[in-house]
Amino acid sequence: MPGFWYHKNLRSPKSAPSFHTSDSWQVREDRLSTPLTGIYDEKSGTYYTVLRTDTPDCEALACHNYGDVILSGKTSLGFTGFRNADAHAALVFGFPYCEAPRSYVRKLTLAPAVRAFEKLEKGETRRLTWTLRKGVSPSYSSFVADVWNYSFDALDPQPVKPRYTPAEAKAILAEYFAQSYVGDYPLKYTSGVELRTADCESTGIAEIGFVGRVLLNAYNALEYGEANGREDLAANARSIFDSYLRYGFTPGGLLREVVDFKRERETDVYSIRRQSEGVYALLNYLAYEKQQGRSHPEWEARIRTLLEKFLSLQNPDGSFPRKFRDNLTVVDASGGSTPSATLPLTMAYTYFKNEAYRRSARRTADYLEKNLISKADYFSSTLDANCEDKEASLYAATAMYYMTFVSEGTERQRYIDLCREAAYFALSWYYLWDVPFAQGQMLGDAGFRSRGWGNVSVENNHVDVFIFEFATVLDFLAETCDEPRFSRTSAVIKSSMLQLMPVEGSMFEIGRTGYYPEVVQHTAWDYGKNGKGFYNDIFAPGWTVASLWQMLSPDRVTTFFAN
């Protein structure tokens, strides 16, 4: 079930939808990035799918979210899933929606089953269409690719009418850089973590990588400020980099990942993901500065020291532990975050001309091929969860894309092939259709179209704008592999993800211009507040702004490696 269920969801806990809880599941269609269920037989390679092929266009509010509920009006949402039928896997589908054996209403919170009823007047008819299909694929990955291609052709998503040009979008997002700057503490930063949507007041949290992305946003602000006469942005960005050079490292030479000045606490467990995202931002910054004729030998020395820590942390199989302490003692050995390290390692090889970094990057690629891509098992790329998630396959595809810049010949072609395989899996998380909303639900009233937005993970059933370089990766694959569906999907994503831009006249319940929303709740689920059709009340615009900025800078990666 795309964007919701892969294999048996065995990496997800019992408190989320998984085989641990039941061997039969059916869910409402708007939980799925494609309203489809597919069953694949690994022994024979045979698969069956059922796809909703008419257009769901209306939704009705229900007085309860469990048990038998009579809807207040017309809905177009059905359900789909699979069932254990006498030890055989069976496809199920129907109308209106019915979720069993449990519904999923909040992170790690299963609720009782729900069955909806809609009134059908005497003599009234409703016509709904599902298409059954049989196919054969040699592997689970090729099955996912085949089904995605088929679904894309059947649903034919088109770009959303653009509201802003890339330049206009950046001008709006740049207001986040200006308003979120905090200069009251030794570390200067843009405040983008644990903000309230209602007022967007800055918090005391400085976070270098996910979810704050302080260093990447500082680079974005510097580049934009100098190019557009915004000296205020450039000056703030320089102060951020200067403060991190002076105060931003641990005694062991790692980047200080999360510092909460108001609560007077700081993490003492570090992650390969945040460290990698910090180095990634710093190398972009240094390359930009070098192009401007400015050198930073002290920064370069700091980064070299940090990269030596990377080389020490890497396991013999090429993976990196997910979490560790300042003395590099491993806290979480999971290798799911390994692709985040591939990016800065390839960049460091190019910037410093040190072959050790490329060797390390190659070893990460070997690990990803053997343990994630070949097994179609993308997991635990986030900071804490172990479940199946979008970011793992997206990061794997992006890692292989970066490897193509430091390789040639058959080696480069291998990375292209792996990038393509992982990209299909990542694409399966992105919506190919527009879910319907009921009147009074903000997203529906605002005309929101879900096509092009990505489901987050098995544990988190909302959509977001996590994209970064992935649209650029899709355009690269479209040209390199002669696959126009990739570039068409990229166009859908790039147009759709700018829909909810908070700007005067259409703030969409966000307190400040440019603070892009994070938790967009498009189905019967919420992160803590408000439910379908609304945002959660707490959000992290630090990463959403950084993600969209990267999407709006398609030449950034090629420019880095070319220079």
Which functions belong to the PLM regions below?
Residues 1-122:
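Beta-strand/loop-rich accessory regions of lumenal/periplasmic or secreted enzymes
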Residues 120, 138-207, 238-239, 243-258, ...:
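Low-complexity, Ser/Thr/Pro/Gly-enriched N-terminal "stalk/linker" regions
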Residues 163-178, 218, 231-245, 276-279, ...:
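Hydrophobic core segments within long, regular secondary-structure runs in both alpha-
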Residues 185-207, 253-274, 319-340, 377-399, ...:
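Carbohydrate-binding/catalytic loop surfaces
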